[in-house]
């Protein structure tokens, strides 16, 4: 068996590889990327690297498949765009020797388009923020406040809050790429549920609460606490069944303060940035995914609550300098906390990853040696 790692220079991929190396030999891992293969070699000290270019995806993946034709190759859905290429490969060539756990292509595309997902939820009576169509907006059939979002994207990029008539300039809204929802009273109190599924059934679950984000308003999670929120699990059960979902799924919710219902905000249909927490709390989504791909028997795990995950470099460090406090307390290493790009790694390997991915190596080299 081999394990194909795409998008090998991402921080979540680095954590994925370190988790895999707890349970598998280095020879089992195939690294791939559409660029910077030399960086991958330096970070992971490996030669088992292949080009997987967007413009030549099918032919590049064929090379990998043929190279290991006598073995099964596990595919991990690291990034959405890469996974779309993988779906198209499967449609054209069939499974070949690849093993994977994915929903239908239609369900995958629906999940990543926030506009289509919102309409789907409303049509299927799944609680979600109220959706306003372009016609609703032009006919003034809506109530303030509103939120304008990109149809496809993750995080807070492109999001705009519209709280009054003066902030709504209809003729400047790109309705092809953006859509409008009601703005709930607590737009930043997002809770996340993490699911491993097979054919519409939840195999394993955990959730987390955000403690700190960067930037503070609408930013990425840099400090979170694990829990087992059964209301979120119950809320996710319906859409997972309706989409007949298989594989990884992260669902973000906001709790409507007027009804106390959890409303679905968005779905991430691939590996998420805090996947490290899954291993740390014994949810073990990575090994579970592989077992499900291979139709192996699985045993239930006791998932731990009240554990933490921190993304120290660079964003928690930036937060510290913007909000100074006792450094010994802020940076204290704790046993109940896992650290993005450090836990399950070693200091030298983590340093190499940070150096080759966060810094421009060529420019730094020129400054050091060319004055």
Task: Provide a role label for each language-model segment.
Residues 1-101, 369:
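ATP-binding N-terminal substructure of ATP-dependent carboxylate-amine bond-forming enzymes
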Residues 91-163:
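A conserved helix-loop-beta module that forms one wall/lid of the active-site cleft
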Residues 182-244, 268-293:
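ATP-dependent carboxylate/phosphate-activation module, predominantly the ATP-grasp catalytic core
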Residues 127-129, 145-147, 157-187, 215-219, ...:
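Conserved ATP-binding module of the ATP-grasp superfamily
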Residues 291-371:
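Peripheral (often C-terminal) accessory segments that flank ATP-dependent C-N-forming ligase machineries
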Residues 146, 203, 261-266:
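Protein kinase-like catalytic core scaffold
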Residues 37-45, 88, 138-143, 169-174:
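Short loop/helix-cap segments at secondary-structure boundaries that form the rim of catalytic
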Residues 246-257:
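A short glycine-rich, hydrophobically flanked beta-strand micro-motif that places a catalytic Asp/Glu
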């Amino acid at each position: 068996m081999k394990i194909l790692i795409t998008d090998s220079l991402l921080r979540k991929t680095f954590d994925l590889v370190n988790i895999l190396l707890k349970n598998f030999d280095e020879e089992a891992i195939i690294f791939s990327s559409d660029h910077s293969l030399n960086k991958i070699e330096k970070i992971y000290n490996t030669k088992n690297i292949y080009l997987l270019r967007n413009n030549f995806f099918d032919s590049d993946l064929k090379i990998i498949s043929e190279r290991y034709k006598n073995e099964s190759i596990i595919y991990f859905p690291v990034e959405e765009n890469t996974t779309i290429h993988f779906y198209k490969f499967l449609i054209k060539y069939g499974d070949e020797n690849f093993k994977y756990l994915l929903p239908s292509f239609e369900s995958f595309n629906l999940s990543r388009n926030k506009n289509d997902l919102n309409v789907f939820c409303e049509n299927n009576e799944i609680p979600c923020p109220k959706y306003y169509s372009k016609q609703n907006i032009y006919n003034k059939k809506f109530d303030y406040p509103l939120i304008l979002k990109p149809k496809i994207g993750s995080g807070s990029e492109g999001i705009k809050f519209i709280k009054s008539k003066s902030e709504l300039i209809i003729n400047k809204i790109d309705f092809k790429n953006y859509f409008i929802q009601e703005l709930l009273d607590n737009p930043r109190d997002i809770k996340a549920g993490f699911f491993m599924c097979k054919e519409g059934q939840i195999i394993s679950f955990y959730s987390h609460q955000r403690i700190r984000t960067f930037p503070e308003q609408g930013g990425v999670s840099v400090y979170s606490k694990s829990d087992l929120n059964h209301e979120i699990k119950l809320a996710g059960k319906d859409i997972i069944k309706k989409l007949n979902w298989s594989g990884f799924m992260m669902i973000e919710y906001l709790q409507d303060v007027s009804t106390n219902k959890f409303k679905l905000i968005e779905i991430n249909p691939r590996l998420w940035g805090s996947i490290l927490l899954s291993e740390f709390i014994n949810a073990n989504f990575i090994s579970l995914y592989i077992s499900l791909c291979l139709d192996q028997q699985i045993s239930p795990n006791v998932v731990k609550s009240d554990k933490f995950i921190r993304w120290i470099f660079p964003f928690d460090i930036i937060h510290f300098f913007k909000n100074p406090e006792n450094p010994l307390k802020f940076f204290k290493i704790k046993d109940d906390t896992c650290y993005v790009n450090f836990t399950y790694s070693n200091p030298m390997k983590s340093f190499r990853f940070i150096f080759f991915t966060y810094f421009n190596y060529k420019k730094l080299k020129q400054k050091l040696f060319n004055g």
